[in-house]
């Protein structure tokens, strides 16, 4: 794989070495059929298994697969051999944003442009239940047109990564960019921690240096905990006001991405751009506003874990990366309907088919039994108002299961389905 000119999986010609991290090397490559330029991250499977990094890799795949946005590095496909995992990603040619600020501060209008793209992308991530947890200039790339691209979701957490208190409990991120509550180790909201990191990045772009600096790590943590910031005198009043709201040590009063995007400093010079990929993804939020039972439903509906989400996604069957499993007779679809609506519809379909229908109270499972086959359906939450529904044969004849699905159940669900997988 390290040799320039070698061919990977009969699909990609490997090019020059681009860089490496602790567990991965990145190469430029070219798709043999299309000629498209890509970046391939090569991960040593044995190394990550030895150090217990399996879940982190699964999270990165899940996060990147869920996110399709102009300002997020796109994951095209994942491949694997016995010893390696390959992430085939969009090749971002403009280098790191870090290189732009390594020589000093940026002009206010330039810094604002990058910050606008960053916050819009982070807000999009959060709407999909994903927090990045390691936002910093080194993880922000620039394309050939100077547009920002967020990369490196290795530390990302989906909403299912939380404990019962709804908080994350692992200290992630680079020290200078982490929020006070992350350092405290008492659990934190990853979405609010991302906002803090965005504030640190904005400060660096405008000032040319970090807001919290100390050679002693404990002293650095103290400064972060107290949000001790000295603003340079050249900072515009509007930028200073916004930074104070973002770099609030109290996560409960810290400004949200939504409010940041409404601030006058943020909106200055902002042009509303038509982004088809964003609009397409945003459809899943069309019915995000629920009734009074929505909060209860959110608690009861089972969240897919990160690996399950990606494994269920079209074109990304990763079951063989780390474990082997038996093939199951099942079909899946995504929906933007509430879990209660989906289960009610499934009950209705079962009754129309004269099947024996059983639904447990407070659970989003429906069992439809006929003489020849048994179909079980379960609803999983991927993000708020975005669900994955799994319909599987739990008994009876496989041919009859497929017939019932094709002729009756699938057509009856047409208004509930975003996509079959």
Swiss-Prot record:
UniProt region (PPI), positions on chain: 328-357
GO molecular function, one term: protein serine/threonine kinase activity
Catalytic activity: L-seryl-[protein] + ATP = O-phospho-L-seryl-[protein] + ADP + H(+); L-threonyl-[protein] + ATP = O-phospho-L-threonyl-[protein] + ADP + H(+)
Record's keyword terms, sorted: ATP-binding, Kinase, Manganese, Nucleotide-binding, Phosphoprotein, Serine/threonine-protein kinase, Transferase
Expression (tissue specificity): Ubiquitous. Co-expressed with CBL1 in guard cells.
Active-site residue list: 134 (proton acceptor)
Location of Phosphoserine modifications: 156
Residues that, per the record, bind ATP: 18-26, 41
EC number: 2.7.11.1
InterPro entries given in the database record: Kinase-like_dom_sf, NAF/FISL_domain, NAF_dom, Prot_kinase_dom, Protein_kinase_ATP_BS, Ser/Thr_kinase_AS
Gene3D superfamilies per the UniProt record, alphabetical: Kinase associated domain 1, KA1 (3.30.310.80), Phosphorylase Kinase, domain 1 (3.30.200.20), Transferase(Phosphotransferase) domain 1 (1.10.510.10)
Role this protein plays: CIPK serine-threonine protein kinases interact with CBL proteins. Binding of a CBL protein to the regulatory NAF domain of CIPK protein lead to the activation of the kinase in a calcium-dependent manner.
Name of the protein: CBL-interacting serine/threonine-protein kinase 15
Organism: Arabidopsis thaliana
Gene name in the database record: CIPK15
């Amino acid at each position: 794989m390290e040799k320039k000119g070698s061919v990977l999986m009969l699909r990609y010609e490997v090019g020059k070495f681009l860089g490496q991290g602790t567990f991965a090397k990145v190469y430029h490559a070219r798709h043999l059929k299309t000629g498209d330029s890509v970046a391939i991250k090569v991960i040593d499977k044995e190394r990550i298994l030895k150090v217990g990094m399996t879940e982190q890799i699964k999270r990165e795949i899940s996060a990147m697969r869920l996110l399709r946005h102009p300002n997020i590095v796109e994951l095209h496909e994942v491949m694997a051999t016995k010893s390696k995992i390959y992430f085939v990603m969009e090749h971002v040619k403009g280098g790191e944003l870090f290189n732009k600020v390594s020589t000093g501060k940026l002009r206010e209008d330039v810094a604002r442009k990058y910050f606008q793209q960053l916050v819009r992308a982070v807000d999009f991530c959060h709407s999909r239940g994903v927090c990045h947890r390691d936002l910093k200039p080194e993880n922000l790339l620039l394309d050939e047109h100077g547009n920002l691209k967020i990369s490196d979701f290795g530390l990302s957490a989906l909403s299912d990564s939380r404990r019962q208190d709804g908080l994350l409990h692992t200290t992630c991120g680079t020290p200078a960019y982490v929020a006070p509550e992350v350092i405290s180790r008492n659990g934190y909201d990853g979405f609010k921690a991302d906002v803090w990191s965005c504030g640190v990045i904005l400060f660096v772009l405008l000032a040319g240096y970090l807001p919290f600096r100390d050679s002693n790590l404990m002293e650095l943590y103290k400064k972060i905990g107290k949000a001790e910031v000295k603003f340079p005198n050249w900072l515009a009043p509007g930028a200073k006001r916004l930074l104070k709201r973002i770099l609030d040590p109290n996560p409960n009063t810290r400004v949200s991405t939504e409010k940041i995007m409404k601030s006058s400093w943020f909106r200055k010079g902002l042009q509303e751009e038509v982004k088809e990929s964003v609009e397409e993804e945003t459809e899943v939020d069309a019915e995000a506003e629920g009734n009074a039972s929505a909060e209860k439903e959110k608690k009861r509906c089972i969240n897919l874990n990160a690996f399950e989400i990606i494994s269920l996604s079209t074109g990304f069957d990763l079951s063989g990366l780390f474990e082997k499993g038996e093939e199951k007779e099942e079909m899946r679809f995504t929906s933007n309907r509430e879990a209660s609506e989906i289960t009610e519809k499934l009950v209705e379909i079962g009754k129309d088919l004269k099947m024996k229908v059983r639904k447990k109270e407070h659970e989003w499972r429906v069992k439809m039994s006929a003489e020849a086959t048994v179909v079980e359906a379960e609803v999983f939450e991927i993000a708020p108002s975005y669900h994955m529904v799994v319909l599987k044969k739990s008994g009876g004849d496989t041919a009859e299961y497929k017939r019932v699905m094709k002729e009756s159940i699938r057509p009856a669900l047409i208004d509930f389905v975003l996509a079959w997988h």
